């Protein structure tokens, strides 16, 4: 999420301004962050949509026809959530691009059956609200208390003007959470 914000200077400025009222000398106003920072929330959901590459496992409880395939009772079905998050019918034609406004323009997307960053059913993450609040407070402190920007150095993984290139995600494996960048691709 930090990388997506840092690589877009307009978004960086917008997030800094949006979270500013939540950062107080004695701490964070979490209520403000959760209820008044719609751009931050949209960035959070979009980052989760693009980087969450885990699986959901369900047991087939009765014979079920899926397309032309019969799933027998007792078998397990494994579903990669990243495929749900790449549904063009739900998320639009630019599914592989980070769109910081995707969930701002369509708040209903966060409740879509194709958006499962925290699992679902009995495996719905009980810590999802806490995790979101921790991430929001980290972002608020990071961008409010310090003037953070990308380093400009020549070398590998840099553009011709010395800017760091966006980290490439390691999409080669399913994870238990967020996809890591390829080795050497950290921000």
Show where each model-derived region lies:
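Central I-helix of cytochrome P450 enzymes
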Residues: 1-21, 78, 127, 135
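Cytochrome P450 heme-binding "Cys pocket" and the immediately downstream C-terminal segment
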Residues: 11, 128-174
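Conserved cytochrome P450 K-helix E-x-x-R motif and the immediately C-terminal K′/meander segment
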Residues: 21-69, 109
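Conserved cytochrome P450 K-helix/beta-meander segment immediately N-terminal to the heme-binding cysteine loop
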Residues: 79-107
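Active-site-adjacent bridging/hinge elements
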Residues: 106-117
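C-terminal helix/juxtamembrane-tail motif
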Residues: 168, 172-187
């Amino acid at each position: 999420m930090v990388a997506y914000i840092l690589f877009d200077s307009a978004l960086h400025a917008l997030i800094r301004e949006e979270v500013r009222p939540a950062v107080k000398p004695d701490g964070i106003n979490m209520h403000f962050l959760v209820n008044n920072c719609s751009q931050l929330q949209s960035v959070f959901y979009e980052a989760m949509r693009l980087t969450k590459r885990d699986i959901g496992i369900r047991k087939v409880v009765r014979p079920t026809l899926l397309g032309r395939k019969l799933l027998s009772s007792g078998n397990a079905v494994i579903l990669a959530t990243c495929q749900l998050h790449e549904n063009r019918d739900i998320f639009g034609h630019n599914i592989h691009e980070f769109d910081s406004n995707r969930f701002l323009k369509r708040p209903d997307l966060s409740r879509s059956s194709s958006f499962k960053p925290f699992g679902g059913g009995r495996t719905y993450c009980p810590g999802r609200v806490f995790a979101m609040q921790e991430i929001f407070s980290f972002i608020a402190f990071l961008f409010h208390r310090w003037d953070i920007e990308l380093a400009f150095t020549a070398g590998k993984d840099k553009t011709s003007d010395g800017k760091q290139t966006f980290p490439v995600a390691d999409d080669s494996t399913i994870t238990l959470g967020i996809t890591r960048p390829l080795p050497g691709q950290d921000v």
